[in-house]
Regions:
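Short, Lys/Arg-rich flexible segments
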Residues: 3-201
Length: 201
């Protein structure tokens, strides 16, 4: 998922044309870089304020590339485990809430209830030391899971959306922040043009 933000220089064209070509390019590139970094922070904050997931690494998942004409923010990431969102095991049904403005919803499909447990193979051990344990220690993979049928085996972990999908949401994240990004770009462009003009005085 990536978003491209272009430049509307109509409001600064008169002054912009008075700059030399090299200074025009520098001002545009500087404005785009600054705006892209501001956008990455705003997108991350908006996503964190929208979803119940903890430590999703929204900001780290976004990479910026910019030229003198446009900036691109790319987000990468796999679907997140549902256990990383708000989950309640109270009562006889596991419930989960993905949106902060949402509510806890029971996880039941075809009368089969989800559960929270270690779903790693009981014989699986770590091959080398890691922050989660020493080599040879048993692997634990805690997840919200659900059986695929009535039989005991055939278990699948439950996932929510990926980081790029959440960040790119027109309704909840990108669509909310986009007007601010456009305004920031115009403000930043004016600022760098003013700086260039001051150097030429």
């Amino acid at each position: 998922v990536y978003k491209r933000q272009g430049v509307d220089a109509s409001g600064v064209n008169a002054v912009f044309k008075r700059l030399e070509s090299k200074e025009q390019t520098k001002a545009l590139r500087s404005a785009l870089n600054l705006t892209a970094n501001q956008a990455r922070t705003k997108l991350s904050d908006q996503a964190q304020n929208t979803y119940t997931v903890k430590n999703a690494g929204f900001k780290k998942s976004m990479r910026i590339s910019a030229t003198s004409k446009y900036a691109v923010i790319r987000a990468e990431g796999a679907p997140l485990l549902l256990k990383d969102f708000k989950v309640s095991t109270r009562g006889n049904v596991v419930r989960a809430q993905v949106l902060k403005r949402g509510r806890l919803k029971p996880l039941v499909k075809d009368e089969i209830k989800a559960f929270v447990n270690n779903i790693a193979n009981k014989h699986q051990v770590r091959k080398k030391d890691s922050r989660k344990g020493k080599a040879g220690s048993r692997v634990r993979h805690i997840a919200v899971a659900q059986r695929e049928g009535r039989k005991r085996l055939g278990i699948e972990a439950k996932f929510s959306n990926s980081t790029p999908v959440m960040l790119g949401s027109a309704k909840r994240v990108y669509g909310v922040v986009e007007p601010e990004i456009g305004k920031d770009l115009q403000d930043n462009l004016r600022m760098f043009i003013d700086k260039a003009m001051e150097r030429n005085v």
